[in-house]
């Protein structure tokens, strides 16, 4: 495998169809919504935040955004961004998860 940056994000309870991944200018943006499940009753402790979120992750190396891939399994998002041989021109690329938008 060529050298790559690997980004792993914990996203428990997030529907992968509600995730958007964008790589541009040495930044990976992970955005989406964690919806509150229909729960009833009283809770002593709730450790999940709900609602829209966005994370901007700086990338240490220039990456080949066109060859990026992502996998979402059991609440864990793994993004693989191959390191570019030379600095690419700045472009914004939407990364699909497991072949789905």
Residue ranges and their predicted role:
Residues 1-101:
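Alpha-crystallin/small heat shock protein
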């Amino acid at each position: 495998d060529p050298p790559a940056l690997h980004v792993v994000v914990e996203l428990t309870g997030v529907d992968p169809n509600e995730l958007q991944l964008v790589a541009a200018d040495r930044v990976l943006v992970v955005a989406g919504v964690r919806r509150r499940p229909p729960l009833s009753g009283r809770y002593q402790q709730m450790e999940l935040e709900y609602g829209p979120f966005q994370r901007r992750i700086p990338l240490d190396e220039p990456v080949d955004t066109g060859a990026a891939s992502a996998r979402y399994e059991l609440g864990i998002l793994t993004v693989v961004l191959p390191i570019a041989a030379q600095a690419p021109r700045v472009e914004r690329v939407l990364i699909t998860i497991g072949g789905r938008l």
